[in-house]
Amino acid sequence: MKTVAFTTLGCRVNQYDTDAMRGLFIQKGYEPVDFDSKADIYVINTCSVTNMGERKSRQLIRKAKRTNEDAYIVVTGCYAQLAPDAIAAIDGVNLVIGTNNRHKIVELVEQLETTEKQINAVRNIMEQATFEEMPLYGNEIDKARAFMKIQEGCNNYCSFCIIPYTRGKLKSRRVDDIKQEAQRLVDHGYHEIVLTGIHLGNYGVELPGRPNLAAVVKELLTIDGLERIRLGSIESVEVSPELVELMATEKRFCSHLHLPLQAGSDAILKAMNRHYTLDEYKELIRNLRSRIPGLSVTTDIIAGFPGETDELFEETLNTVKEIGFTHIHAFPYSKREGTPAAVMDNQVPEAVKKTRVALLNEQGSLGLQTFAANLVGKPAEILIEREEDGWYEGFTNEYIHGRIKKGDTEYQIGDIVGGTVVSVDGEFVTIA
């Protein structure tokens, strides 16, 4: 049996794509193995959000070549879509696929075996108008929760972002296809599904009848055995009253939202071509917390965007302190060639970016500790993801690390178990 190894860089959408491609190989009789193992085929699913992502992608390609110089090396994902010729020039690369036509990956690999010629299968992503179906069946995922992509592409064109050029226009998945996949995942034992997309909040705008994200959630709530539905990243301006009402009234809809802020300064938000003001973002948070007590809010923030002075960064830091996020994914601005921000004046030095990221991460840790302390004495459940040193560990409904001491009752990975939060211990809330 031929073996295939996968590695993934970047976002949850990329992770879904990898799981789906793994499933295609499994269906054709290939055996998945660890990426560090010697394999017949290596698939590197790349990221292009930052220069670091592209550099890591190149490193992983070369690592695969060193591990087995006779293997077929397949490179896919956003970096492959953006720079196919550069990737094809890397020694050992046999097949380059971008962010479409991945449903043909096995066919293309088998074509390599007969032609022994490098294949560049990257096509113009802007010409793809419909969602590429690569459904999951459950056996291709080795995690406690399942990520399910329901939307692809983005039309926002934030001034710092390369993704619209690598993922193309908005493309949504049919509600029936989403529900069928969710049912298969539940039948396979998954109790939590995370809905993901490049521009999740714009789900359905191009479909007949314009079904929205709330309609998808409502449909999934009819599935017996699905105990948790969680949203991936969603833009604040796309959190509809219907979604808020569902989260406020439906226990299975997790009380956690990841709402990218990107900057806490109106001047920087405008330069980023974001579609909200700071006051609008804050007002949404106030309304959400009023309607959904105990809501956990996490975010993304870019440090050192062009023109971000010390004073403007201080505005962002003060905003973060005021809102109290439970996690901040802070990262330094990365200049992406071809985006408006790449040619803006007043680029910020790397050392300054690094310092600002550290300050933001510090505030994220403080926000988490405050939120976790407020959970003490309250009921909580975790989805078990691992067993380590006598503890079951996982995430609560609010996406807080939790743990339960292993006792007489044996639990399995993927089980949801609960009790009362008795303490906060480092990064965990302890439940008994």
Residue ranges of model-derived segments:
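Generic beta-strand/beta-sheet core signal
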Residues: 7, 196-198, 232-234, 260-262, ...
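Radical SAM/AdoMet-radical enzyme domain recognition
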Residues: 187, 214-215, 219-223, 228-229, ...
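Short, electropositive alpha-helical surface patch
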Residues: 208-221, 241-255, 308-325, 350-354, ...
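Terminal RNA-binding accessory module
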Residues: 343-432
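Residue-level signal for the nucleotide or nucleotide-sugar donor/cofactor binding architecture
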Residues: 100, 173, 211, 238, ...
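Proteins enriched for Cys/Gly/acidic motifs involved in redox and nucleic-acid/cofactor modification
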Residues: 1-203, 218, 242, 253, ...
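Conserved strand-turn element in the central/C-terminal portion of the radical SAM core barrel
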Residues: 157, 161-168, 228-237, 263-274, ...
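Hydrophobic, well-ordered secondary-structure elements that form the walls
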Residues: 259, 300, 320, 328, ...
